[in-house]
């Protein structure tokens, strides 16, 4: 079965600029290359650990909850979140998010040269655009090629089905 044929949802947040401002003003504890700190991550960029719940993150999670109820009704879920900040040369290794049900990426800040999200099997590239969220089945393998700019910021997370 070609998993890339599974439903991928792409939407834009109608109030992105106000959410972006909140998220970029909030303080986060970023680590670089978490392998050095004993934490295994596919992300080779600055990233946070754990499940974030700042005001800006909560606004994004609430919007994603609305999208899930509209497009994937009939199940209970829990949404996690972390932030990744990519500078020039940073990237994310190919991976999936099994055993969660779905995963997402929300593009907070995308300067010119921001890398796309690439689904590995199909090679489909989804352009990084501010305010865009991509919700996809967790089994879909994906990666982020080397970034060509400073300051690409994303919120990503898993959507756990209960």
Predicted features and spans:
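Non-heme Fe(II)/2-oxoglutarate
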Residues: 1-74
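Catalytic core of non-heme Fe(II) oxygenases with the double-stranded beta-helix
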Residues: 75-146, 150-162
């Amino acid at each position: 079965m070609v998993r890339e044929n599974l439903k991928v949802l792409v939407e834009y947040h109608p109030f992105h600029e106000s959410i972006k401002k909140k998220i970029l003003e909030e303080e986060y504890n970023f680590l670089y290359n978490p392998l050095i700190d004993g934490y295994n991550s596919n992300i080779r960029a600055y990233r946070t650990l754990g499940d974030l719940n700042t005001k800006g993150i909560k606004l994004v999670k609430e919007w994603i909850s609305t999208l899930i109820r509209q497009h994937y009704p009939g199940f209970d879920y829990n949404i996690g979140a972390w932030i990744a900040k990519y500078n020039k040369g940073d990237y994310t290794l190919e991976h999936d998010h099994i055993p969660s049900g779905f995963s997402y990426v929300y593009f907070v800040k995308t300067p010119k040269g921001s890398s796309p999200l690439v689904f590995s099997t199909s090679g489909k590239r989804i352009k990084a655009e501010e305010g865009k969220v991509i919700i996809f089945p967790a089994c879909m393998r994906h990666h982020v090629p080397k970034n060509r700019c400073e300051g690409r910021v994303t919120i990503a997370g898993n959507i756990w089905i209960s």
